[in-house]
Amino acid sequence: MIRRWLTSRLYDAFLVCAFFVSAPRIFYKVFFHGKYIDSWKIRFGVQKPFVKGEGPLVWFHGASVGEVSLLAPLLNRWREEFPEWRFVVTTCSEAGVHTARRLYESLGATVFVLPLDLSCIIKSVVRKLAPDIVIFSEGDCWLHFLTESKRLGAKAFLINGKLSEHSCKRFSFLKRLGRNYFAPLDLLILQDELYKQRFMQIGISSDKIHVTGNMKTFIESSLATNRRDFWRAKLQISSQDRLIVLGSVHPKDVEVWAEVVSHFHNSSTKILWVPRHLEKLKEHAKLLEKAGILFGLWSQGASFRQYNSLIMDAMGVLKDIYSAADIAFVGGTFDPSVGGHNLLEPLQKEVPLMFGPYIYSQSVLAEKLREKEAGLSVNKETLLDVVTDLLQNEKNRQAYIEKGKSFLKQEENSFQQTWEILKSQITCMKI
């Protein structure tokens, strides 16, 4: 008991220190980009969320857009088979809240930003909502949120779980902390055997662990709609044009691609830049201007009829807009401090996939894609040649599309396995 109390106090102290270290950056985003203004009351516990109705409650949580989006087939199936349950969906980012509201409010879910995990804030929220089940998407577990839910009798599960090599080393160094952090989870449903070994390395019993594959490979029919014609018409791309979508790009990705794009003088090659963070839009624009690349902004009504390069300065459209592409690149993979983003979205839209050398956030998946030749790993030196070959060779592009479809087909049972495990837990509960 004393050890648990001490761990909680040290964890609180760490969060407070982290807040003060990040404060200048946070206030910069508030005053110059208007971020966090709509969510600060809930984040700091000033305003408590309210869930309508009666019945058992399941609380889903994911860090941001990607983690929240993968919950879609799960919530749809849950609603079909257990309609008496109420849903709560939380996320740590405003973009994630925007996405969750778009996807889940029509299912009756209550969506809000996760309050800070300080014991004096989150515990009162958990007590008010009193969830029967808490489900964490991929790995965004928060200690006080988890332990308070368990104290109140909730079941807690991790789905599509993963643990990076960096996090594994950190928790291995603090093995007791790692065990305390994840031990309250009743089940860990993981993407791969490698992640299983890492969780066991930090002290999690193998009895709690199931390996089902990556849920992101599952394509719900309603989510797999390919709107290629719709987006190409909206972007004003002709049938002769070739479109490269650069998704979730960071400034370092832009620097590398700007050099390559400057070689494309052919007006039939169009480039759509989709920033990961809209608050860095000015930085992206300056990099393109420095490289002498003329571009327009989507928000200002620009299209490919006027420009060969467009910046998509809108939220929540990337996954859909991949369908318009002839080639797709996933950003964050030329930035060693980021380590990549969702590699599967282009494949789900039947588009050839490229990614850079820094992909440690999804290293296992990246290696599988390389082995199956379902994705192209490029670096600064090879990028121009690879892109040129794909643009000029439709047969090669189609080959990568077919390999991508085959890869997804082989992996698509991951969702069904995950659902069967969760379903067995739901039906055993006495509500």
Curated annotation (Swiss-Prot):
Instruction: Please give the superkingdom of this protein's source.
Output: Bacteria
Sequence intervals crossing the membrane: 5-27
Q: Which Gene3D superfamilies match?
A: 3-Deoxy-D-manno-octulosonic-acid transferase, N-terminal domain (3.40.50.11720), Glycogen Phosphorylase B (3.40.50.2000)
Per the record, the pathway is: Bacterial outer membrane biogenesis; LPS core biosynthesis
Q: Which cysteines are joined by disulfide bonds?
A: none
Pfam families noted in UniProt: Glycos_transf_N (PF04413)
Chain positions recorded as CMP binding sites: 275-276, 315-317, 342-345
N-terminal signal peptide: none
Chief localisation class: membrane
Q: What is its EC number?
A: 2.4.99.12, 2.4.99.13, 2.4.99.14
Q: Where in the cell is it found?
A: Cell inner membrane
Q: What class of enzyme is it?
A: transferase
Print the keywords alphabetically. Answer: Cell inner membrane, Cell membrane, Lipopolysaccharide biosynthesis, Membrane, Signal-anchor, Transferase, Transmembrane, Transmembrane helix
Site features described as Transition state stabilizer, chain residue numbers: 138, 216
What are the BP-aspect GO terms? lipid A biosynthetic process; lipopolysaccharide core region biosynthetic process
Its record classes its membrane topology as: Single-pass membrane protein
Any one Gene Ontology molecular-function term assigned to this protein's record: Kdo transferase activity
Q: Name one GO cellular component term.
A: plasma membrane
Q: Which residues form the active site?
A: 67
Say which family it is in. Belongs to the glycosyltransferase group 1 family. Glycosyltransferase 30 subfamily.
Q: What does this protein do?
A: Involved in lipopolysaccharide (LPS) biosynthesis. Catalyzes the transfer of three 3-deoxy-D-manno-octulosonate (Kdo) residues from CMP-Kdo to lipid IV(A), the tetraacyldisaccharide-1,4'-bisphosphate precursor of lipid A. Thus generates the genus-specific LPS epitope of Chlamydia, composed of the trisaccharide alpha-Kdo-(2->8)-alpha-Kdo-(2->4)-alpha-Kdo.
Name this protein carries in UniProt: 3-deoxy-D-manno-octulosonic acid transferase
Species of origin: Chlamydia trachomatis serovar A (strain ATCC VR-571B / DSM 19440 / HAR-13)
